[in-house]
Amino acid sequence: MKKNWIVLILLIVSFCSTQIPIYAFTNSRKAYEKTGKVIWEVNIKEKIVAITFDDGPHPVFTPQILDILAKYNAKATFFVAGNKVKRFPAILKRQVKEGHEIANHTYSHIYDKNITSAKLTAELDQTDEIIKQISGYKPTLYRPVGGLHNDLIINTAIQNGKLVILWSWHQDPQDWRNPAASKISKYITKGVKPGNIILLHDWNGSEFSQSSQTVKALESIMRYFKNNDYKCVTVSEMLYRSIKVIPAPFDPFYQ
């Protein structure tokens, strides 16, 4: 049911893409949100948030993150790199088994403002195929590396059956820079609001790193959410429960 909801969104967005003029990158968020092509956060009153992790799976940190999420009965969305999934398939199997969402973050973690549609399609397809071989399903969500987005990237994603997910602007603690765990947790909790999409990274440092500030911060973040009645759900779950997920002209609540 929830997957069908995402498909419906993509169909509506695809229709809008043919009816609404292409916007330049400089128009960015306002233009893309108006058409429903990109999601930064969700307009919802429920005290739910979507916590997301990019760049994994990591052989040490991702299992530690999964342990913490399980402790608090929280669900997350993992935007995985295909080349890492290929190396650590057992971790992805665990993520799926424990009810987390797997989303596409390209195969080789490519960041290129001049990327062609053909190259991006190949990156998405290769990652989709690996995920499907391991989990049995093809992801419907995609996050561009570094949040890099323009018309070509977004429209290519839509043409490949992907809804583009970014993150709430005030919910990026830049944990990849390895700040103190207390700074990461404070950054997230001080401004949290219902419908926020939170950006974190489960791949920090190298494959052989043994300590992650993100993992250290996560326990504190989860404790705060629990004490303040916030529930962590997947991105798709939050979209499904939102009344403001489709473009306004198609929204039955639109006035």
Task: Set out the residue ranges of the language-model regions.
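A cross-domain feature marking catalytic cores of carbohydrate-active enzymes
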Residues: F53, V80-G82, N104-T106, P144-G146, ...
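CE4/NodB-like, metal-dependent polysaccharide N-deacetylase domain
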Residues: L66-T77, E101, S117-D151, N155-L163, ...
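Charged helix-capping and loop-helix junction motifs
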Residues: L120-L124, A180-S185, S212-L218
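A short acidic, helix-capping loop that chelates divalent metal ions and anchors anionic groups
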Residues: I110-I115, P173-D175, G205-F208
